[in-house]
Curated annotation (Swiss-Prot):
This is Succinate--CoA ligase [ADP-forming] subunit beta. Pathway: Carbohydrate metabolism; tricarboxylic acid cycle; succinate from succinyl-CoA (ligase route): step 1/1. ATP binds at residues 50, 57-59, 106, 111. Its cofactor is Mg(2+). It comes from Salinibacter ruber (strain DSM 13855 / M31). It catalyses: succinate + ATP + CoA = succinyl-CoA + ADP + phosphate; GTP + succinate + CoA = succinyl-CoA + GDP + phosphate.
Amino acid sequence: MKLHEYQAKGLFRDYGVSVPDGIVAETVDAAVDAARRLEEENDATLFIVKAQIHAGGRGKGGGVKLAHSVEEVREHADNILGMDLVTHQTGPEGQTVRKILVTEGVDIDQEYYLGVTLDRETSMNAIMVSTEGGVDIETVAEESPEKIQRVWVDPSIGLRPFQTRQLAFAMGLEGDAFKQAVASIQGLYEAFEENDCTLAEINPLVQTPGGDIEAVDAKVNLDDNALFRHPDLEEMRDLHEEDPTEVKAGEHGLSYITLDGNVGCMVNGAGLAMATMDIIKLAGGEPANFLDVGGAASAETVEAGFRIILEDPNVEALLLNIFGGIVRCDRVAQGVIEAAKNIDIDVPLIVRLQGTNAEEGKRLLDESDLSLRSAVLLKEAADEVTAALGED
């Protein structure tokens, strides 16, 4: 789950990270009121109007504008709200802007990068800093990796004071700015760890001419599997920013990710799902989705899975690959039969059932009047996919 910038900034502020004052707005009038409030309470004379979508590269796409007056805020808000903002992370269709953040402007002397993420190779948390702030850290890592400094934090020990100082030194800071950077690093790490984040990022973290350290942007990704421990964060979820098909799948307890291929697949277990996608590619097709029905597959979830997959007009064949451990194959087969009664399955259907009650499941399918192709081995399933695509 991703947070909007304004939500991430609010979270960071709770952990002592200095963040410029800002107010979120959903209408032009609300944006103007926000600017006037910042003008009155903070003596702000410079404003930044920022589109709130779950994607980077907003500035290059026209979603971040500088305003020197309240009237300019009105003009920019009118242009940004409702626009389909296209960035390198949204795809060509873009994302509709429904909210903007109006913040007071900050004079910038130097930009830095600060981020915390999970390093799966070491099973530790990695904190990264760079003097190349304000640009994609991936670009810096590729072109100038020596400009990124990292420390790894063992979760069983926690972040040590010498590590925060090491990072602040790597940023080239001294004096009060050094102390503020140490506090920002400590606060960001605590926010990351205590809220089960997979990523907490400030890009850029800036130093003002007066030597203050401010987080002028913020990004947070949360671990979906830990959201039950953070109901306050789960309430921040913005379904408008997520794939509607994936949201619908989640409502049925299905793990679904849309892909660009032509073969739909329904599988139980993430490992088997990835192996199935490999099989589809070897067969000459491209997977149209990742769909894991999990360990509690029922007739209802199978039918929901079929509906979701078949909504994709690019699907030319459908492979159902089930290994029955906790899942009973006869229950899945019954789900297929029930789904076929309620849905027009107008593409070739290949079914592979192995494991618990597989023979009973095959019997149910054989005795039904469904037009489908059965497979026992993965290779057979691949051959059937090849044949189905060749007939199209």
